[in-house]
Each structure stands twice: as structure tokens, then as C-alpha cells.
């Protein structure tokens, strides 16, 4: 969503995401409840505590993440992840966040339906998502659009995958 400063780009996104945020809050409350039960069972060393699995928080949205975190969160929620950046250029700046970060290439691969795999995070097992579903939404100011018009985004086809919405002024 593109518009001048103060045009009101953020409120429509907040309204659209309200049901998702409410759902995510319910997931968080459920996770906290299950974690309390798990920790209580482990603390008392109940007979069934060894069979209990530590609960995992399912997330629906991300706003600040590494590539490894994106794969992990998507692995924990195979239904999909939405990336919501109020200022979309913040996400795109993160494509260079850690030097030779393959974030941009991975986002292009996700768009093409390629699997995601994470073997570098220190977990008991690697994470793999066969059919990723990652949606990206955000806003920017009209004058900042030129920051998207650079070879890094144009030559890779990244810009071709963006739907730009520019509402008419009142």
C-alpha cells in the first residue's frame, strides 16, 4: 500500500489483521496454559511428564525475523505465515542484514513454491516445509518507491512479484 505520509495507510492494515491478531492471541493463551501444565508436570516429576511433549507456540504473523526463524515458525505452523511490515522497506533492508544473507533469494524461491529447509539452527531435528505459504504485506511512502527501483530488486524479478496499491487521494 503506497501513499503520502499521513494518508492513513496503516489503519486499513490494522483492521484487516484484527481477526488474525485475535486468533494469534488465542494461540498464545493456549500455549501459555499448556506450558504451565507441562512445567508443573516436570516439576513434580509426574509419571506422565516424560511422555508429555513441550508445547510449541504456533505463530501466524512475523514482523522482525531471520531466515532461520521464518523457516522454524513456518515449520511450527504449516498452514502459512504472514509477514506484516508497516514500512515494507524495513523488510527489504533486512535482506542485507547479516552480510551475505540469502533472504531475497529465499523469498523469491518461496514465491515459486520451492521447499524451505533449515539445518543450521541448533535444534534436535532440521525443519522442512514442503509447500510454503508466506504472504508479505506492508506500506511505504510515495517518495520512497524509488528505493525499490534498484537493480537488486529489478534484476531478480522481485519487483515483478509485488502488487502495488496506490489509493486515490480524497
Annotate the PLM regions:
Residues 1-170:
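Phosphate-handling catalytic cores of nucleic-acid transaction enzymes
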Amino acid at each position: 500500500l503506497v501513499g503520502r505520509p499521513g494518508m492513513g495507510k496503516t489503519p486499513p492494515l490494522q483492521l484487516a489483521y484484527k481477526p488474525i491478531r485475535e486468533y494469534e492471541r488465542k494461540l498464545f493463551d493456549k500455549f501459555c496454559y499448556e506450558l504451565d501444565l507441562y512445567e508443573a508436570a516436570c516439576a513434580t516429576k509426574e509419571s506422565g511428564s516424560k511422555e508429555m511433549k513441550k508445547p510449541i507456540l504456533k505463530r501466524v504473523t512475523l514482523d522482525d525475523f531471520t531466515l532461520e526463524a521464518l523457516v522454524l515458525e513456518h515449520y511450527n505452523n504449516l498452514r502459512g505465515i504472514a509477514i506484516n511490515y508497516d514500512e515494507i522497506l524495513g523488510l527489504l533492508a533486512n535482506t542485507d542484514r547479516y552480510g551475505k544473507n540469502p533472504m531475497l533469494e529465499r523469498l523469491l524461491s518461496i514465491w515459486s513454491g520451492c521447499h524451505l529447509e533449515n539445518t543450521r539452527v541448533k535444534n534436535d531435528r532440521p525443519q522442512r516445509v514442503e509447500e510454503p505459504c508466506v504472504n508479505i504485506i506492508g506500506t511505504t511512502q510515495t517518495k520512497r518507491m524509488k528505493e525499490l527501483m534498484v537493480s537488486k530488486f529489478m534484476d531478480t524479478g522481485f519487483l515483478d512479484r509485488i502488487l502495488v496499491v496506490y489509493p486515490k487521494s480524497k
